[in-house]
């Protein structure tokens, strides 16, 4: 199946939108994965974000990005029950993103060709 800008992973609500850039482009009731890798429209060198309108998913993803910890509870007071990945964006990278955002909004995004980017659905880890 060909795709343009984004695609859903299998029968899930997870969207690979790594090359997608569009005002008000969020698709409701999804986990929309964005990339800020150096080739992307909002180029921060690395990192990304997952957009969601599901509060429960947001809370779980936030914990996962902080090594499975709740960022609002002191480390010593927690009994971790969630797998964590240490994937939070540093304040410096977030600040750079805010600096670059006005220009990114005004700039026409690159149109990616399907052959330029791997389709995650073809990778064993997602099968």
Task: Give the label of every model feature segment.
Residues 21-127:
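Active-site region of PLP-dependent enzymes
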Residues 1-35:
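Conserved PLP phosphate-binding loop immediately N-terminal to the Schiff-base lysine helix
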């Amino acid at each position: 199946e060909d795709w343009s800008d984004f695609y859903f992973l299998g029968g899930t609500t997870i969207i690979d939108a790594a090359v997608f850039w569009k005002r008000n482009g969020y698709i409701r009731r999804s986990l929309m994965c964005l990339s800020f890798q150096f080739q992307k429209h909002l180029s921060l060198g690395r990192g990304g974000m997952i957009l969601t309108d599901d509060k429960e998913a947001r809370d779980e993803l936030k914990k996962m990005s902080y090594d499975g910890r709740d960022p609002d509870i002191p480390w010593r007071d927690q009994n971790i029950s969630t797998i964590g990945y240490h994937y939070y964006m540093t304040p410096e990278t977030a600040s750079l993103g805010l600096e670059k955002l006005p220009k990114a909004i005004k700039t026409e995004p690159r149109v990616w060709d399907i052959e330029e980017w791997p389709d995650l659905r073809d990778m064993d880890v997602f099968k």
